[in-house]
Regions:
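Glycan-recognition and catalytic cores of secretory/periplasmic carbohydrate-active enzymes
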Residues: 1-507
């Protein structure tokens, strides 16, 4: 991980964020940012925080981010993040949300939470099926022109602001803020961006309110245009990433609606795309098709672990374990090594591929490592799961050492492999116990995405809770007061009944 950080820092664009390449395009490096946040969390490496904060700010303020409707575009065609390829992908937005929420968690800066909420609102409004599952993408073109849906002439822009009741001074100031000119910056029209951060623009509370009015009016006007085509396929692996992102946002930002969104999508995948022991890859027009790949099993399985952390419903852990066992059965090679990507049902392949490169999404093997090691730390099949994860790491050892920048998600999982995380168990007779609620609230808001914690109160399904190794012998009765256990490798300290003392010990 240190070598990866060093190499990323060598190519870091300290002025515009992101990482320089030989080509003109810049892609969102969200997985690299997640690795940097983990490294900063553990070692306080200030280079990591610099790369994260500079890049997130530059991307959010650039044309690559939809300043009116929210959501991140596929990539920028310039190094300033100004001119995007206007296609929007579910996975890009999921990873971006994760990076924003994690940045908020480690820095406490409220703007990251605001930006994450804005991106989630785009997903809720435009990318969520009535069933609760998430669509795959939105095209770049409408009416045969790339970006036509998103760009503005100065004339139309000012017309909308005037109709919204904004005075001349406010209109001119908003024009400057979003860098709108008569000449434009994209084929005579304007891609909106924020060249100067809001905090440096001299924006007071009144201007922020006027900006919100303008944004709402522009979004309403834009809704009259012909939208780009939406790809309404429901893909299991990509939904897994968004479920993980929303679960993280729900618990860290204390937004139950985000957790509900994640829960609805997870239930859809489980009930409609998992049947007779097979996870399917795609759902569209009422039909599931194609046996799932390693990426489908590992990313959806991992999302159930993230959903458990947000809901504390042990059913999600049980389901994650079931998927992990199916994954091992379907994709583990005969000899120790990395898992196959293609399902055994795909008979037309002469050789089953093995993939470790973390491209636009984490590789199936990277996500499989996280699923296996997290379940092992929860106490399930610990020796077997750790051994399998170690075999995957061994297979990619040379690639990780030679080119760690191509494997940021896999590098991130080295923390799970070589560092034994602390484990936490909180129990109470009632979910309304004030000490219990305070303990749970701290764990959800402050713990990183790899934290191992369980909780149980006497009002939940105790049969399911009894299946959690960390709760063995600790199932509460109605009369019991709250207790917090701090453990390592399943060995626990004396239970702590006071929430404030518990928070001091774990902070």
């Amino acid at each position: 991980t240190l070598k990866a950080v060093d190499l990323f820092y060598q190519s870091f664009d300290g002025y515009r964020g992101g990482f320089l390449t030989n080509g003109p395009n810049k892609f969102p490096p969200s997985m690299a940012l997640l690795l940097m946040i983990r490294q900063y969390d553990r070692n306080q490496d200030k280079r990591c925080l610099e790369m994260v904060e500079t890049t997130l700010s530059a991307m959010k303020r650039g044309g690559i981010y939809d300043q009116i409707g929210g959501g991140l575009c596929r990539y920028a065609t310039d190094h300033d993040w100004l001119v995007p390829h206007f296609e929007k992908m579910l996975y890009d937005n999921a990873l971006f949300i994760m990076a924003l929420v994690e940045a908020h968690r480690v820095t406490g800066r409220e703007e990251y939470a605001i930006w994450a909420r804005d991106c989630i609102e785009y997903i809720r409004r435009d990318m969520t099926d009535p069933s609760g599952a998430f669509y795959s993408a939105e095209d770049a073109d409408s009416d045969g022109e790339e970006g036509k849906f998103y760009v503005w002439s100065e004339k139309e822009f000012l017309e909308v602001l005037e109709e919204a009741g904004l005075n001349l001074e406010d209109r001119k100031r908003i024009l400057r803020f979003w860098a709108v000119t008569q000449r434009g910056n994209f084929e005579g029209s304007n891609i909106l961006s924020e060249p100067v951060p809001l905090s440096e623009f001299g924006a007071d509370e009144r201007f922020v309110q006027k900006l919100a009015i303008a944004r709402k009016a522009l979004l309403s006007r834009r809704a009259r245009r012909n939208r780009p085509l939406r790809d309404d396929k429901v893909l299991t692996s990509w939904n897994g990433l968004m479920i993980s992102a929303l679960s993280l946002a729900g618990r860290v930002l204390q937004e139950p609606e985000y957790t509900n969104m994640a829960s609805r999508a997870a239930e859809f995948i489980w009930s409609r795309l998992y049947a007779e022991g097979t996870l399917y890859r795609r759902f569209r027009d009422g039909e599931r098709r194609y046996a799932g790949t390693l990426s489908d099993y590992s990313l959806f399985g991992g999302s159930l672990l993230d959903l458990y952390r947000a809901t504390l419903d042990p059913q999600h852990l049980m389901r994650a374990r079931e998927l992990a066992d199916k994954m091992v059965s379907n994709f583990k090679p005969e000899n120790p090594g990395a898992f196959y990507e293609s399902p055994p049902e795909q008979k037309e392949l002469l050789v089953r591929p093995v993939e470790g490169y973390d491209g636009v999404i984490p590789s199936g093997n990277s996500a499989a490592i996280r699923l296996l090691l997290t379940l092992a730390h929860y106490g399930y099949e610990a020796a077997d799961y750790v051994r399998l994860a170690r075999h995957i790491f061994s297979h990619f050892k040379g690639a990780l050492f030679e080119y760690p920048q191509a494997h940021p998600y896999m590098c991130m999982n080295l923390f799970l492999m070589h560092g034994i995380p602390r484990e936490f168990a909180v129990t109470a007779g009632s979910k309304d116990d004030p000490q219990y609620k305070k303990m749970i609230g701290h764990m959800m808001e402050r713990m990183d995405p790899d934290a191992i914690y369980v909780a149980c109160h006497a009002d939940m399904d105790l049969n399911l809770a009894a299946g959690l190794p960390l709760l063995e012998g600790r199932i509460p009765e109605k009369k019991d007061t709250a207790l917090a256990y701090i453990c390592k490798d399943m060995a626990c300290q004396k239970p702590e009944p006071d929430a404030e003392e518990f928070i001091k010990k774990v902070s």
